[in-house]
C-alpha cells in the first residue's frame, strides 16, 4: 500500500496486486458525519438515526465536500467503506476499501484499497429541495483512474477557491 507521503508500506498485499494511495489517510475533513449502514443508515459517531439532510444539502449545493459511508452488514464478517470527494465541478473522486474477517476480529485485518475512480455527480431529483433533501448523492459513469491522486492533489482540489 502507498501511504500519503509516497512511502511504500511493507504490509502491502503480495502477488503483484497494485498498491493504491490511501485517500482515507489523507486527512480530508468530512463535510457531514460519517454514515453507517447496517439495517438502516445512522450517524456513526452517535449511533442515532440520520436523515441524510447534510448529504442532501451537499448534493444540492454542488460544491466541494467529502462524505464517508461505512457498510457494516451482519453478521460482521465483512466491512466496506466508501470515501467520496466532491470536487465542485460535477465530478467526484471515489475510493472504496474492504476487509473480510471470517477468523479474526475485523479491526486486526488490513484494509484492501480499491482503485481511485472518477464519477459524474448526477443531478438531484426534483424531490430534493433546499432544507428538504434526505438522500445520498447519486454517482454515475464511474471509471477507474490510470493513476492515483496524491494527498497533495486531493488537498488542492478540495481547497476553497479564492
Feature-to-residue mapping (PLM):
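Signals and flexible motifs at protein termini associated with secretion
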Residues: 1-162
Amino acid at each position: 500500500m502507498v501511504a500519503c507521503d509516497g512511502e511504500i508500506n511493507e504490509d502491502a498485499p503480495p502477488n503483484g496486486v497494485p498498491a493504491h494511495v490511501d485517500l482515507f489517510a489523507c486527512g480530508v475533513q468530512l463535510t457531514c458525519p460519517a454514515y453507517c449502514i447496517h439495517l438502516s443508515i445512522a450517524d456513526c459517531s452517535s449511533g442515532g438515526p440520520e436523515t441524510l439532510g447534510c448529504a442532501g444539502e451537499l448534493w444540492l449545493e454542488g460544491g466541494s465536500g467529502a462524505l464517508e459511508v461505512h457498510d457494516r452488514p451482519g453478521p460482521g464478517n465483512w466491512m466496506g467503506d466508501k470515501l467520496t470527494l466532491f470536487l465542485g465541478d460535477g465530478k467526484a473522486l471515489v475510493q472504496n476499501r474492504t476487509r473480510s474477517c471470517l477468523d479474526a476480529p475485523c479491526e486486526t485485518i488490513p484494509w484492501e484499497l480499491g482503485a481511485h475512480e472518477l464519477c459524474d455527480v448526477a443531478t438531484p431529483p426534483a424531490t430534493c429541495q433546499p432544507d428538504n433533501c434526505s438522500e445520498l448523492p447519486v454517482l454515475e459513469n464511474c471509471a477507474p483512474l490510470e493513476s492515483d491522486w496524491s494527498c497533495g492533489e486531493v488537498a488542492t482540489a478540495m481547497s476553497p477557491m479564492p
